[in-house]
Amino acid sequence: IYFLLRKKKNLYITSNLVLRVNSLFQYFKKKITKKDIYYIEGDYIWGRKIKLFGWRSELNEYSIIHGAAIHIIDLIMWITNLKPISVSTYANNKPTKNTKFRKNSLVVLLLEFPNNILAKISANASACHNHIHELKIFSKNKILVNNNFGSYEYKRNKLYKINSSYPDKKNRKKLIQNFIDFLVKKNKKLMIKHQEQFDLMSVCFAAEKSMLQKKKN
């Protein structure tokens, strides 16, 4: 795909990375100071266990890394505008091993980023929980948080609530609309560049390799 897109200048692809158009995470991106970040936690809690037992259980190649964790990986890469240096992946299928879905249903990724930033990402597909993208961004003097209790900023030992419309589903259409407008009108800038998608896939492949080989990549 990479070489085909480089050869055919009139070919374009996009991806369903809708967290980029979520107004809360766009706010987080504006609020961070990259040099001050030292740790990020992102948890994709799927909350729709029943979906595992449809086509996902029948597809040998299906991976919770590419089907769930990828969204948090992209979110952190997009917010920081950084690509990880290394990744170690741990996984199990304890909740689902006696079901139709025998693949790993929980993955945990530990990533090293430039600027001495560490990140922990999990994708939990079998939890008895609502669907949510939890995020914590730890900086020297503040923490940005989104969880089941809402969205907050901790600063100077005080807690400030962030008024947000998370999960902000109405904004998801902006991504595909941007792609269509780009193809039709040619006067729009793509929200997701080709190179960003290839960088994201390379991280996911490295995470998958680490999981299978049980070592850092």
Language model features by range: what are they?
Residues 60-66, 162-170:
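A short glycine-threonine-serine/GTX helix/turn-capping micro-motif
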Residues 12, 114, 180-217:
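C-terminal helix-rich "cap/oligomerization" subdomain common to oxidoreductases
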